Amino acid sequence: NLFISTETDTGYQHTAGLVILDAGESRDFCFEKLAAFVAERISPIPQFRWKLREVPFGLDLPYWVEDDKYSIERHIHRIAVPAPGDMRALTELAAYLYSRRLDRSKPLWELWFIEGLAGKRYALLQKLHHCMMDGQGAQRIGEALCDFEADPPPRPIPPEFLGATTGGAPSELQLYARTVGNLPDLMRETDAGV
C-alpha cells in the first residue's frame, strides 16, 4: 500500500477527525456508554480488527491479517484537557494526539474521548491510518458513529465495509511463498525503473 511505503519517522499517513459533543441535559452521558456504543457500531466492520503483518526481510509489502489479540479497549482512550477547558487547550491536545504515530502492532486506529471542556461538552478524536480506508470512507464511518438526535435509530454501516475478509493470517511459510511468487514482478518493475 502506497500509504505504508511512503510513511517516514516524521511523516505519518494517518487521518483524523475531531467532533465536539454537547451532553446538554443528559445526566448519564459518560465514557463507558460511549465506548459501548462505538464497540457496537464498529463490531460488524472487519477492517477495524485487521493489523499489518510485515514480510520477513522486507521483501514484499505488508499483508492485512486478523489481530488475534484484538480488544476494543486497546483502541478507545480517555483523556482530559487542562483547565479552563477552552478551544486552545482542546486544539493543543488534539495536535499532540494527532502527532503520535499509530502503533503498528495492532489495528491502525484510535478513538480519543476528551473530557474537561467548558460547558458540559466533550470531544471525540477519531484517528486512523490512510491505508485502512480513504478519507471518504473514514467520513462515512464517522457519520455512522455520530448522530444529532438524543436517541437516534442506528445508522447503517456503509455496505462496502461489511463482509470483507483478510483470508486468515498467513503462516511464515505462506509469507515466504507469496513473496517468492511476487519476486518476478518486483524484479521487472525494478528493471523498468518503476
Task: Indicate residue ranges for each PLM-predicted region.
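Soluble acyl-CoA-dependent acyltransferase catalytic core bearing the H(X)4D motif
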Residues: 16-194
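M16 family metallopeptidases and their MPP-like homologs
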Residues: 1-6, 11-20
